[in-house]
Amino acid sequence: MRARWRCLALLLLGLGGAAAAEEDPYLWLEEVQGERALAWVREQQQATEQALQARPGQAALAEGLREVLASPQRLAPAQQLGEQLYNFWRDAAHPRGLWRRTTLASYRSAVPQWQTVLDLDRLAQEEGERWVWGGASCLPPQARRCLLSLSRGGGDAHVLREFDTVSGRFVDVAAGGFALPEAKGGASWVDADTLSVYTDFGPGSMTASGYPRQVRLWKRGTPLAQAPLLLKAGADDVGVWTWADDAPGRATHLIERRTSFFAGEQYLLRAGRLVKLPKPDDASATPFGDQLLIELRSDWEVGGRRHAAGSLLAIALERFLAGGRQFQTLFAPTPGSALQSHTVLRSAVLLLRMDDVKQRLSEWRYTQGRWRARALPAGELGSLSVTALAGQRSDRYLLTRSDFLTPATLELAEAGRDARQTLQQLPAFFDASSHAVEQLHARSRDGTAVPYFIVKPRGVPPPAGGWASLLYGYGGFEISMKPGYSGVLGRGWLSQGGVYVLANLRGGGEFGPRWHQAALREQRQRSFDDYIAVAEDLIARGITSPKRLGIMGGSLGGLLTSVALVQRPELFGAVVSQVPLTDMRRYHRLLAGASWIEEYGNPDLPEQWAYISKYSPYHNSQAGVAYPRVLYTSSTRDDRVHPAHARKMVARLQAQGHEVLYWENTEGGHAGAATIEQQVKLWALSYGFLAEQLMR
C-alpha cells in the first residue's frame, strides 16, 4: 500500500488578493485548445526551436541523447500475470510501444524471447488515435482477461477496455466485454463478471479536483448507469479509488475515499458490503495475510502507547476489526531515518528505509505470533527500488539498484534467500571514471541542515568562477529525491563538463512525515529557503558562481524554480522550469489543482492567500529586475498541471521585458513527452539551453 500511496500521490501529483481573475490579462491562455492560445503556442515554439536548434553542437547532443533513450540495452522490468511475465517496451521501431510476455525461465536467460501481445503503434494506426499506454489490471489467477488503460496523448484521463490475452483481442462490448469511456477513473476485478468501478457517471459524479466521487459494483452485461452504488464521496473530497490484492485464498478488495491529499477512509469489500477500517484518517493500511499493516503520518496514542508519525505497525486484521489495539512495531523513525516503502509478498514484508538519504533494506516475517527481521545487503550512496513480481502470490521480487555513477542493475530475488540473480544491467552511457559523488549539507535560513549530493570531477579543484552546475530539487508531497543513474543526465550534462547537484529539501520524504509537514501551507517558504541555501552554499564553497549555476525542476519543482527565479534571480545564470505551477491564485481551479489544497493552502481564504501571495511566481515577477534567461516547457495534453501555468508565466515575463523561451509538446501528459523522439527533443532543448547559458 505504501507504493500505491506514492503512486496516488504522483497521480494527484476568489476573495480579495492581488491579480483577481478579472484582472488577469492572460486568462485566454487557459483555453487549452483555444485557437488564439494555440497560435501563441506555435509562435513561441518556433522561436524557441530556432534559437536553440541552431546552437553549435545541438545536433550532436540530440543524437547522443537518442542513443541513450532508444538504446535496446535498457532494463525490462516485468510483472508476473498468471504463468507469464509481462513487460511494456518502447524502442525506435515501436515509439508507442509493445505489450509483450515471456516465461520465467526465458526471462532469467541472457536473451529473453518475447512474444508480442499488443502492438500499440498498430492499434493507434488502425483506430486513428494517439494511444499512450497506461497499464493493465488482470483477473487472477490465470490473467486471461485484463483491463487495459489507454490515454489519448498521455494524459491522466484514459479509456479502459477488456482484453483477452489468449486471443490477443479486445473483448467486444456487444459480447459482454467491459469498457469505460475516457475519464480520470478506473476499475478493479471483484470476480470474472464483476468490477468495482470509479469513473465519470455523469453530471455531479466528479469532485472539484476532477476525480470520481462514486464507486459502483458493475456486473457484466448490465448497463453501467444501473450499477449499484457502493460508496459516494463529497464534492470537495479528492476522490475515490479501489485496489485489489490477489493473495491465494485470502484475496482482499480495498475501497478508499480520499477526503484530502493525505487523508481518507479505507474499506474492505466483503460479500458485497463495506467494512470500514478504524484507522487514523491520515494513516494507510495494507492487508498482509491475516495481518494488517498501518503506516502513520501523525502521532497516534492508542492502546496505552504513543506511536510516532512515520511508524509502521502490525496487528491481526480480525482482532483490529473487533477493537484490538495492541500493535507490534515494524518500524519507528529516528531523527535521521524514515520509512520509504513496504512491499508485501506471499510470506514476507520488505521494508525500505532511508538513513540520512542512504537506503537500507530489511525482510520481515510473521511466525509463531511474532515479527522477526533480517537485514538485506544494499548499497551506500545509491537508489533501491523493490517490486513484487506477482503481488502476494509469490515470494519473488525485483530489486533495481543504481547510483549516480553506476548503471542500474535489475535483480531477481526471493524472500528468505540471500542469493540474487542479476537479470540485466544498463551499459555505461557516459564515462563515469572521472567523476566523484559527495554528500554535503547547507544551512537554511532557520538553521536547519539541508543535505545535498554533488556529482563533480574527481580530484580536480574547481576552475576560476567554478564549474557549470545544475541544481535540481522538488521538496513536496513527501516524495524523496534519491541518487540514481541517468544516462540522459550523464550524456546531456555530465559528459559535457557539467556538475550535477541534487537537493533534499523540506517538503520531501527523505526524513519522513515530519520533514514533509515542516514545509506545508504557511511553511512552504522553508522549502524555497532550503533550495536557495544549497545554491548559496555551492557558491560559498567555490564550486560554482551565479553566472554558472543553473536550476531545473518539474511540476512542484517547476514552482520551486520559478519561485527561486523571482526571489533570488542574482544567484542563477539559467532556469529550466518543466510542467510547472506558477499561478497560485488560480491553481485550485485548474484541472487537478483542488486536490493539492492540503499541500499549498486555499487561495480563496484571505488568511491563506496572504502567505501564498508572497511566493506565487506569477504574482511576484517584476519588470526592471535582472532575471537570468529562462526556458519553460509544458504539454498541451497535461491534464494534471494545466499548461496555462507555464503559458501565462511566459507571457507575463515577456511583457515585463525578460528573456524567456517556451516549448509546449502537443502530447505527453504530465510527463511532457509520449514517445522516444519527443523525449529526445525535450531533453536536447533543455540541456542545450543550459549549455548555451552556463558553459560560454
Regions found by a protein language model. Give the residues of each.
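Non-catalytic accessory segments flanking enzyme active sites
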Residues: 39-138, 149, 238-258, 262-296, ...
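Beta-propeller blade signature
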Residues: 100-103, 161-166, 212-221, 267-271, ...
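Cap/lid segment of the alpha/beta-hydrolase catalytic domain
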Residues: 121-142, 150-157, 169, 174-176, ...
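Short, conserved, GDST-rich strand-edge loop motifs in beta-rich repeat architectures
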Residues: 151-152, 199-213, 296-307, 479
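Polar, glycine-rich mid-to-C-terminal structural blocks
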Residues: 212-258
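Active-site-proximal cap/loop segments of hydrolase catalytic domains
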Residues: 489, 502-696
